[in-house]
């Protein structure tokens, strides 16, 4: 199935994703926020989108080597996701959920609906915007939350 465009009229308390490839994680997180889910647990998989966009003169040595660029892209993608969930009112943690020896894809995004001040939410969005500008990236979740026509 495809999470992009999936709709439900049922109440959603928790959204769980495991290795939703590339932007599928973004659509799952976006839908979780639209559904006003109380809890989100997401283990992203590959982050190809940002790897194809990222560039930085300041970080040129990191952009030169494919494996370093790939890992930086993955970390940048998940950091943006975490901050955007904060922006949308979720207390968010990014944690290692299994040891690296078992899986290199071991970051869990854990988000719980919370009462986060408008000031903190706007700060999270501004930090994401600055990071995206610096790295020349426009991740799908950022576009969905800032250019979407739905009020969340």
Explain the meaning of each model-derived region:
Residues 1-152:
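Class I S-adenosyl-L-methionine
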